Amino acid sequence: MEPMSEPFEHWESAWDSPGFVLWHATLRWGAAMRAALAPHDLTHVQFVLLASIGWLVEAGGAPTQRAVADHAGADIAMTSQVVRSLEAKGLVTRERAAGDARSWRLGLTPEGKARLVEALEAVEAADRAFFGAAPDPGSLPSVLRALARRDRSGRIVEG
């Protein structure tokens, strides 16, 4: 069988492809997050939604489940399932929104606040260790923000 040279001519090595490198970095970062969150009995998705609720509550009030999903960049159905699991763990409160029987307002229980603070410290320490290995870790947030704020067509979708 002859090698497929044409499709691979753009990069000298797979490790020169930004997508391939990002994939591997994401795998390693995900493993670091799982290790940091395991002692707190939280999955990464649970942590992200718990933290999003915390951020939005701090910004002013009880966010809707939709607002939390949007903030986290998560699917609304998946958010609903995960929020119910956080509620079952005693970390989150859910109350029907006034005037809309389909909408839920979310908050953190005292245990949820405490768990979030502990988990956030662990995640931030893991982030410092992981991203600190980069040549210029201070530039990473702006680079990642520029990429994360674009939709599939390349348009900027968030501030």
Predicted features by range, described:
Residues 65, 83-84:
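Short, hydrophobic-biased segments on the C-terminal half of alpha helices
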